[in-house]
């Protein structure tokens, strides 16, 4: 399991709590971890006998990590940009992976996190409608219709 948070300071509090509850070590990866230490943590996590839980800051989670041993992702707090969360989740789910990955997102009702979740869903819907649009108006217009569509209506623009 990989737990993502945007706050390294929060992970420093969460990891000892999880370690106490689960009875196993919970390493922390964040932007301040040196490259050699980061590589050692990832290698240890990737081993079958390695720790079953890894706490990762969102920003550290978006820079070339391969955490496919996990099959659960927990986003503890939300980030405004859904692509950042997606990129973090993609550290666990990679092309060619045979096991499923379940992504859990924690949101407390009535908080700013709930509002952020709404903004994120609206952004996803907007991006989806732009990318997967089935609108065919432009592709089915005649040349005359297209020319009229893109031409400037001087009278309408100036009110004259």
Task: Pin down the residues of each PLM region.
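Conserved helicase motor "Helicase C" RecA-like lobe of SF1/SF2 P-loop NTPases
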Residues: 2-44
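Generic hydrophobic, helix-prone segments enriched in Leu/Val/Ile
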Residues: 22, 116, 156-160
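Intrinsically disordered, low-complexity segments enriched in small/polar residues
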Residues: 29, 62, 155-157
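Glycine-rich phosphate-binding loop signature in dinucleotide/nucleotide-binding domains
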Residues: 47-49
């Amino acid at each position: 399991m990989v737990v993502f948070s945007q706050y390294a300071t929060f992970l420093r509090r969460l990891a000892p709590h999880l370690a106490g509850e689960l009875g196993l070590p919970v390493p922390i990866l964040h932007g301040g971890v040196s490259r050699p230490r980061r590589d050692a943590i990832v290698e240890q996590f990737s081993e079958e006998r390695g720790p079953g839980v890894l706490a990762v800051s969102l920003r550290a989670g978006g820079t070339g990590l391969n955490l496919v041993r996990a099959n659960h992702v927990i986003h503890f707090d939300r980030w405004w940009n859904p692509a950042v969360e997606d990129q973090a989740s993609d550290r666990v789910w990679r092309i060619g992976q045979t096991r499923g990955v379940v992504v859990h997102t924690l949101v407390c009702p009535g908080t700013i996190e709930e509002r952020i979740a709404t903004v994120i869903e609206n952004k996803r819907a907007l991006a989806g409608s732009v990318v997967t649009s089935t609108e065919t108006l432009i592709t089915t217009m005649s040349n005359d219709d297209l020319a009229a569509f893109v031409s400037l209506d001087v009278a309408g623009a100036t009110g004259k």
